[in-house]
Amino acid sequence: IPLAWWATARLLRLDVPVRAQSDGETPPGKSPLFDRASVPLFLSYAGAGLGYILPMTFLPLLAKDQLPADHWLLDGAWFLAAVATILSPSIWNYLGAKIGDLPALRMNFVVQLAGVLAAVILPGALGLAVCAALVGSTFVGTVMLTQRIGRALHPHQGPRLSAAMVSVYGFTQMAGPWLTKQWLEAGGT
């Protein structure tokens, strides 16, 4: 709570200048949010939301089905994912600065895919541990890199773009488990 009070006091002291607008300029927020440049980013971000939430939602269930009752990964898979999540932002930030945000985001998606496939292809504890570490390591990187790319595409859309992308990501994270349930009840595997 003291940190929250300190942060609030600092935020209240911020002096954010109002941007002057020329007559011929489109007012911020009045140009389209979805266009040829941003739609692929939104769609890939939605896919990343599904790619993250599905393995993370069902990781404990997979662990329970594949491991003995006293195995440390029953609870430890979440710990591995958390440690990977904590360590990853600086890595993805470095890669984004070094090779560019778009190539880093593509790499992030490949790492996420490898993590999802590990849970399916590698049996038992190894697959679950690799899934937790790889998928966990991509979560914050996906968000950070996508937000930066979005702001580069539409610098004038800052808050609107961020809000729309967070909404898309959140929607897919809520819809993913429900869609999976429907799929499984319909006989899917």
Describe every region a protein language model picked out.
Residues 37-86:
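Extracytoplasmic gate region of multi-pass secondary transporters
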Residues 154-188:
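A late C-terminal transmembrane helix in Major Facilitator Superfamily
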